[in-house]
Amino acid sequence: AKSVFDALGADTYVINNKPNGLNINNNAGSTHIEGLQKFVVENGLDVGFAFDGDADRCLCVDEKGNVVTGDHILYIYGCYMKEHGELMNNTVVTTVMSNFGLYKAFDEQGIGYAKTAVGDKYVYEYMAKNGCRIGGEQSGHIIFSKYASTGDGILTSLKMMEVMLAKKLPMSKLAEPLKIYPQVLENVRVTDKKAAQNDPAVQEAVKAVAEALGDTGRILVRESGTEPLVRVMVEAPDHDTCQKYVSQVVEVIKSKGYAV
């Protein structure tokens, strides 16, 4: 990454760049971004970029030290593409785990969106079938299909710099319109995740929460792909509301005897 930014004339600093074969993502990278936040603020930098071990993910830190997630990146570059007539089908591809606030922000900008299962392979599959140019995940897997069929962290960081320079705005201002909703996620270990998720009483509880939230939030209940877990997630205007509705659904799962 440093060689790319140096070649483009940026003043570049690098941290956590001394691998020894054992320290991959050790208090570093996109999964441990706190050190980068501190470094950006203490050194008065314009922006910071955090990559994961294989550099297919990228998260940003704005000049104030705030984390700019994959959802923010999709919003910022989706709007930029729309402004330049490059947003094919007027659609940004996301996954079901993108924050509710992202969809509210897209609605305000007149940008359409699609939701896929979690996983960048599902994002790209939808993009390829439907001719979409940008898609990704909250975690920072961002796909620009004009250039690649998978996430590329360095490409993502360059695209963010492109918008900052073109619009002459700091990262904080570019990310500001997207208001991230509070989220509560609870993992329930169960004996049979499919049966638990499809139980009529559980589905009725989920439906009741969805109706109560209306257009102020959302509930998502899904099974883990790798563990015997059912994940119950609610996003709403405040944390207490999230917790209340998550607890309601979790209690139904437990009352039906699925919880371990």
Locations of the language-model features?
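Phosphate-binding chemistry for phosphorylated carbohydrates and sugar-nucleotides
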Residues: 1-167, 180
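Catalytic-core signal marking the mid-to-C-terminal active-site face
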Residues: 167-260
